[in-house]
Amino acid sequence: TATICDTLAVALAGAADPRASALLATLAGGPVQAPGCARGLAAVDAALWFGLCAHLLDYDDDETERAMAHLSVPCLAAALALAGDDGALLSEAYVTGCKAMLMLGAAWNPALHGAGWHPSSVLGVFGAAAAASRMLALSEAQSVEALRLAAALASGTRGAFGGMGKPL
């Protein structure tokens, strides 16, 4: 889709930023080749690095009505890190993650944003968990547990804007 291509393009641009290089220097090697990365990374690190690169310049997509968030970065980062060469499954997982963010965003916004939370961060962990659940073909019980873990990790205030906290 166009949003996947857009996210890949902004991630490649972000990969040239010195802040992306600084993060990359802290990450161990592994088998996953993240777009724009000169070396392989562990899946979790590939998702982290790609997510940072894709959101670093703040040109990624922005859904402004329900989720009030950048949908593509967390969903695509999780799906790409687990995709291998299965493009069809990657697309399904990406859409699954975006739908999760949209459903939660419709329930929680505009109050979430109005209370000072950054919806991309708060909702993004759910989108990433949903996308990863699809990529890994988790059972319903396993997917529920992945979403519970996402709830435990959901955070991100708009007070982080202006620093590395926003793209991270």
Residue ranges and their predicted role:
Residues 1-168:
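N-terminal core-entry segment
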